[in-house]
A protein has these predicted regions:
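Short, compositionally biased low-complexity segments
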Residues: 13-20, 40-41, 58-80, 181-193
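Metal-dependent nuclease catalytic regions and adjoining charged, substrate-binding loops involved
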Residues: 4-5, 175-302, 318
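Short acidic (Asp/Glu) and glycine-rich catalytic loops that position anionic groups and cofactors
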Residues: 19-26, 43-44, 75, 148-152, ...
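C-terminal, charged and often intrinsically disordered regions of DNA end-processing helicases
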Residues: 1-36, 268, 273-278, 310-323
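Mg2+/Mn2+-dependent nuclease catalytic core
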Residues: 112-115, 119-215
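Short amphipathic alpha-helical segments and their helix-coil junctions
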Residues: 17-30, 77-79, 147, 153, ...
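Nuclease catalytic cores
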Residues: 11, 15-54, 93-97, 118
Length: 323
């Protein structure tokens, strides 16, 4: 059973419980793609822009930040596979610079100072530990809080915009619970088509968000109890990384239960090792502790065996995904 939930994980479960299982329980990691890499690089460049003095927050400097951020990470393992040649990478970079140029048509970063950036928010809602990172939090001219999220993609048409605020509503709820102040506004900045969608916040909205996330959490717990993570066929299936192993599309898809069992045992062993380390070693445990007779050498040996087994299963599934 997972111990924490983020808004993105909650949305993933709501979209398709099976996809949620593959990503978060089986821990079959989706390789970073070009769109994700671009979004991450754009986000980091915008964050670093506000490290500069206000009068230095120019478009040229923002473009240079994008180049520097990408230069620092382009040879990482998660990125080296993205491009077949320099022309592809150049076109990708030009598109990223265009997104940042669009940002300057929406805001003037020399005219304000964000209150916080890349802020961790976390809190307990009943038995749910909810956490996430918000891009930016400002105070408007009236001194009210505004939560801002950058989106490197395209804004939806107006009638579809409301569901996109789900994460920000939860962040607003956590901020209210943490500091006792209700944010006044939520803002989504879409860079691809230079659009800002905003939404006023009220207490009823936040209570509705609380009810919705708890309902999702209850459904997640039921799925764990019953070991049942059904597929939900939807319009996003064609873009899902896990489609080749999804039973909805492949009746011969590999069973990932053994992988889940491996992950659960590895987590239990790591928790035992962490508990022993926290008190400074086995010798500091009281005589009646259930961990007193723990053989750390044997535990670490078993951990190595399980991780090797897990890596073998993941490789086999990865080969299946790449077919």
């Amino acid at each position: 059973m997972i111990k924490n939930l983020s808004p993105s994980r909650a949305s993933q479960f709501k979209t398709c419980p099976r996809q949620f299982k593959y990503a978060n329980i089986d821990k079959i990691k989706e390789p970073t793609n070009e769109v994700q890499a671009k979004g991450t690089t754009v986000h980091e460049a915008l964050e670093k822009l506000f490290d500069l003095p206000q009068d230095e927050r120019s478009l040229d400097n923002l473009h240079n930040l994008f180049r520097k951020v990408w230069t620092d990470v382009r040879n990482n393992d998660e990125h080296v596979h993205l491009f077949d040649n320099q022309d592809q990478e150049r076109d990708w970079g030009i598109d990223g610079l265009k997104l940042l140029s669009n940002y300057f048509t929406l805001e003037d970063p020399t005219n304000f100072e964000p209150l916080e950036r890349e802020r961790w928010v976390r809190g307990a809602i009943n038995d749910l530990n909810l956490r996430g990172i918000l891009d930016r939090m400002d105070r408007n001219e009236k001194g009210e809080l505004t939560i801002v999220d950058y989106k490197s993609g395209k804004a939806p048409i107006a009638k579809y915009k409301e569901p996109r605020f789900f994460a920000l509503k939860l962040y607003a709820l956590l901020i209210k619970d943490e500091i006792g102040e209700t944010p006044a506004e939520l803002k989504l900045i879409y860079l691809q088509n230079s659009t800002i969608h905003s939404m006023k916040v009220d207490d009823q909205m936040l209570e509705n968000a609380r009810t919705e996330i708890l309902e999702i959490w209850e459904n997640i717990k039921k799925s764990f109890e019953n070991n049942d993570f059904p597929t939900i066929k939807n319009t996003l299936c064609d873009w899902c990384y896990y489609k080749p192993i999804c039973p909805e599309f492949n009746p011969d898809s590999p069973n990932t239960d053994e992988l889940e069992e491996c992950n659960n045992t590895i987590n239990e062993i790591n928790e035992t090792i962490e508990a022993v380390n926290m008190i400074g070693g086995l010798e500091n445990l009281p005589e009646n502790s259930p961990l007193k007779n723990t053989d750390l050498k044997e535990i670490n040996k078993k951990l190595d065996e399980l991780e090797n087994k897990r890596n073998k299963i993941v490789k086999e599934i990865g080969d299946f995904l790449r077919k």
